[in-house]
C-alpha cells in the first residue's frame, strides 16, 4: 500500500505542476508587440459573401480587397466621440460607422489599490486595439459605399442614464440617396448587454438591399485583465456557437493558419479574456455567415453577416442584434443566448465545477465573504467524503498496527523482493487489510480539487475578492506565501499520523512531498490554497480521531 500511496502522491504533485503548464499552453497567449503606432481605422473587414439567395448575395467589405470599401483615413478624434454612461458601462461611440471604440466597466476597478480607475475593455489607442463594429453592407449598405463608411450625427455628444431611468436610447442618423438610416443603441440599467437596431426608411424610387454585419476586432496585445502570478495568461481568443458545437474556441493561432467560414442559424460570436467576454448575438431565427480572419494590419477578427434584407421603394425595414461586453456573469450570459454561459470555461470537469460554483455562490449569499465561503464549502465537501475518508484512515490505522510485523518480514526476507511481497500480501489477508484502501479517497477527491481550481481561476466573482488580513485577492497567489507554508506544515504533520513506509527510499520520498507541494502551491490562487489548508486540518482531526479509536479497540481486544 505504501508504494501505491507514494505513487499517487507523486502523481498529485506532477498534476499540480502540469496544471501550471497546461494553464500556459491551453489558456496562454503570448503577447505580441502592438501592430501600429497610431490609432487604427475602424473600417470593417468581413467575409466576401453572405448567406441567402444567391441572386441577391453581394460582396461585403474586406480589408485589402481592391474592389471593396477603402479604409477610412483615421478614427474620429476623441473629443468628437459620442459618450454614453450607464450605471455599469462607460461607452464611446465613433460617429464614423457607429462603432464602439471605448468601453469601461466602472463596477470593476482596473487595480485593487486604485478603485477609482475602471477596467477598460475596449480601446482604440496607440497601445491597444479592441472594438465592436456593426453596420449595413451589401448592394446598397452604407458601409459598402466607395467613399467610406457613413458619418452619423446625433442630437447630443453625451448621454447618461439618469436616476430612476431604466433604459437609455442613443440614435445615430445618416441619409444617402433618398434612404434614411437610424442606428439605435438601447442601454438598460444593470445590464452589460445592449441592443443595436438598424432602421432603414427607403424614400428612393429603387428597391434597397443590404446585409447586417457585426464583428469584434482586436490586435495581439496582452490581456490587461490577466494578473496571474506565474506570468502566464488565461485564454485570450475567440469563440463561437454552432448547432454541432455549442462552444468552440478559435485561437489567434487558428486565425493565423486559416479563415473560418460557417453558416449557422442564430448562434453567437465572442472574444474571451480573463474574467471578461464580448459577444455579438444575432436574432436566433436568422441565418448568418460566421467568419474569422486576420487583416493586413495584423488584427484578429471574428464576426457574422446576416441574410440579405430587401426593402421595396417607399417601404421601411430594420434588423437587430445584441452586444454583450462585460464580466463573465453566468446568469446574464445564459439569459442572453444558449451556450454563451460556457464562455466561463471550467474545462473538462465542468459538470463538477458548475455545482461547486452554484453551492459556493449560495454560501456567499449568506456569508458575504468568498474566503469564508470557501472554508464552509470545504467543510461540506469533507462531510460528503467522510465515509470514504474514514475507511481510508481505518486502513492506515491498521497498517500502523502491523508496521512491526512488516518490518520483521523485511528483516526475514532481506533482498528477496518476491518472497517479501508474497509474505506481505499474506499478512494483509490475515489482518483483513486492503493495501489500496488509502488510495481511493485521494483518487475520488482529485476531480473535486481540479474542478475547484478552475472555479477559482475562471469565476469573475473571485477577482479582487478579499478574505481577511493579508489576503486581499483570492484569485492570485498569497503575496507573503503564508498559506502555502501553512499547507506544507499541515501536510508534514499529517504524515506523522501515517505508518512509516518500510522501504527507506519510499520514506524519503514521502518526507519530500510537503516540500514539493509547498513549492507548487506558492503560485496557486490563494483561494485554492485556503481550500487545501482547511481540508488538511479537517483531515488531521478526522485521522487522529479514527486512529485513536482503532488503538483503543486493539487494547481492549
From Swiss-Prot:
One biological process term in Gene Ontology: protein transport
Biased composition (Polar residues): 52-77
Membrane topology: Multi-pass membrane protein
InterPro entries named in the record: Membr_insert_YidC, Membr_insert_YidC_N, YidC/ALB3/OXA1/COX18, YidC/Oxa/ALB_C, YidC_ALB_C, YidC_periplasmic_sf
GO molecular function: membrane insertase activity
Pfam family, one: 60KD_IMP
Entry annotated with the keyword Transmembrane helix: yes
Region (Disordered): 42-77
Domain of life: Bacteria
Subcellular location: Cell inner membrane
GO cellular component terms attached to this protein's record: plasma membrane
TM stretches of this protein: 7-27, 370-390, 436-456, 514-534
Keywords, ordered alphabetically: Cell inner membrane, Cell membrane, Chaperone, Membrane, Protein transport, Transmembrane, Transmembrane helix, Transport
Record-linked PANTHER family: CYTOCHROME C OXIDASE ASSEMBLY PROTEIN COX18, MITOCHONDRIAL (PTHR12428:SF65), OXA1 (PTHR12428)
Oligomer and partners: Interacts with the Sec translocase complex via SecD. Specifically interacts with transmembrane segments of nascent integral membrane proteins during membrane integration.
Assigned protein family: Belongs to the OXA1/ALB3/YidC family. Type 1 subfamily.
Function: Required for the insertion and/or proper folding and/or complex formation of integral membrane proteins into the membrane. Involved in integration of membrane proteins that insert both dependently and independently of the Sec translocase complex, as well as at least some lipoproteins. Aids folding of multispanning membrane proteins.
Protein name (Swiss-Prot/TrEMBL): Membrane protein insertase YidC
Organism: Azotobacter vinelandii (strain DJ / ATCC BAA-1303)
Gene symbol of the encoding locus: yidC
Amino acid at each position: 500500500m505504501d508504494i501505491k500511496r507514494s505513487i499517487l502522491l507523486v502523481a498529485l504533485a506532477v498534476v499540480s505542476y502540469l496544471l501550471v503548464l497546461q494553464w500556459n499552453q491551453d489558456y496562454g497567449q503570448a503577447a505580441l508587440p502592438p501592430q501600429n503606432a497610431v490609432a487604427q481605422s475602424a473600417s470593417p473587414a468581413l467575409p466576401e459573401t453572405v448567406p441567402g439567395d444567391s441572386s441577391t448575395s453581394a460582396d461585403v467589405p474586406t480589408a485589402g480587397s481592391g474592389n471593396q470599401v477603402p479604409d477610412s483615413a483615421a478614427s474620429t478624434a476623441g473629443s468628437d466621440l459620442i459618450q454614453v454612461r450607464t450605471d455599469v458601462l462607460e461607452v464611446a461611440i465613433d460617429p464614423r460607422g457607429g462603432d464602439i471604440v471605448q468601453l469601461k466597466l466602472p463596477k470593476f476597478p482596473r487595480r485593487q489599490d486604485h478603485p477609482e480607475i475602471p477596467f477598460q475593455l475596449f480601446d482604440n489607442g496607440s497601445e491597444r486595439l479592441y472594438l465592436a463594429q456593426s453596420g449595413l453592407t451589401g448592394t446598397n449598405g452604407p458601409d459598402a459605399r466607395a467613399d467610406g463608411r457613413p458619418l452619423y450625427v446625433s442630437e447630443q455628444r453625451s448621454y447618461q442614464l439618469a436616476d430612476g431611468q431604466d433604459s437609455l436610447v442613443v440614435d445615430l442618423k445618416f441619409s444617402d440617396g433618398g434612404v434614411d438610416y437610424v442606428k439605435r443603441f438601447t442601454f438598460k440599467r444593470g445590464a452589460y448587454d445592449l441592443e443595436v437596431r438598424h432602421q432603414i426608411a427607403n424614400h428612393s424610387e429603387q428597391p434597397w438591399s443590404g446585409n447586417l454585419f457585426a464583428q469584434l476586432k482586436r490586435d495581439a496585445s496582452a490581456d490587461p485583465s490577466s494578473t496571474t502570478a506565474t506570468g502566464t495568461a488565461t485564454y485570450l481568443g475567440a469563440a463561437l456557437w454552432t448547432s454541432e458545437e455549442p462552444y468552440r474556441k478559435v485561437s489567434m493561432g487558428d486565425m493565423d493558419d486559416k479563415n473560418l467560414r460557417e453558416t449557422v442559424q442564430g448562434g453567437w460570436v465572442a472574444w474571451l479574456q480573463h474574467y471578461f467576454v464580448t459577444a455579438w448575438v444575432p436574432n436566433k431565427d436568422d441565418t448568418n455567415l460566421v467568419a474569422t480572419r486576420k487583416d493586413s494590419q495584423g488584427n484578429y477578427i471574428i464576426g457574422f453577416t446576416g441574410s440579405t434584407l430587401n426593402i421595396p421603394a417607399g417601404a421601411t425595414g430594420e434588423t437587430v442584434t445584441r452586444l454583450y461586453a462585460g464580466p463573465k456573469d453566468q446568469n446574464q450570459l445564459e439569459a442572453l443566448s444558449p451556450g454563451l454561459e460556457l464562455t466561463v470555461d471550467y474545462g473538462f470537469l465542468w459538470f463538477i465545477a458548475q455545482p461547486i460554483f452554484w453551492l459556493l455562490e449560495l454560501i456567499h449569499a449568506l456569508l458575504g465573504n468568498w474566503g469564508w465561503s470557501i472554508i464552509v464549502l470545504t467543510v461540506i465537501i469533507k462531510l460528503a467524503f467522510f465515509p470514504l475518508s474514514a475507511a481510508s484512515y481505518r486502513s492506515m490505522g491498521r497498517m500502523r498496527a502491523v508496521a512491526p510485523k512488516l518490518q520483521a518480514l523485511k528483516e526475514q526476507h532481506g533482498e528477496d523482493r518476491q518472497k517479501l511481497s508474497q509474505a506481505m500480501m499474506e499478512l494483509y489477508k490475515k489482518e483483513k487489510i486492503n493495501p489500496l484502501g488509502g488510495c481511493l479517497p485521494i483518487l475520488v477527491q482529485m476531480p473535486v480539487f481540479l474542478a475547484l481550481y478552475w472555479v477559482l481561476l475562471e469565476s469573475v466573482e473571485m477577482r479582487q475578492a478579499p478574505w481577511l488580513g493579508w489576503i486581499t485577492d483570492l484569485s492570485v497567489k498569497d503575496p507573503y506565501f503564508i498559506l502555502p507554508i501553512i499547507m506544507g506544515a499541515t501536510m508534514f504533520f499529517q504524515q506523522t499520523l501515517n505508518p512509516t513506509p518500510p522501504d527507506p527510499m519510499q520514506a524519503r520520498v514521502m518526507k519530500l512531498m510537503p516540500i514539493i507541494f509547498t513549492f507548487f502551491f506558492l503560485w496557486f490562487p490563494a483561494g485554492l490554497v485556503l481550500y487545501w489548508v482547511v481540508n488538511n486540518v479537517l483531515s488531521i482531526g478526522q485521522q487522529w480521531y479514527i486512529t485513536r479509536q482503532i488503538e483503543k479497540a486493539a487494547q481492549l481486544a
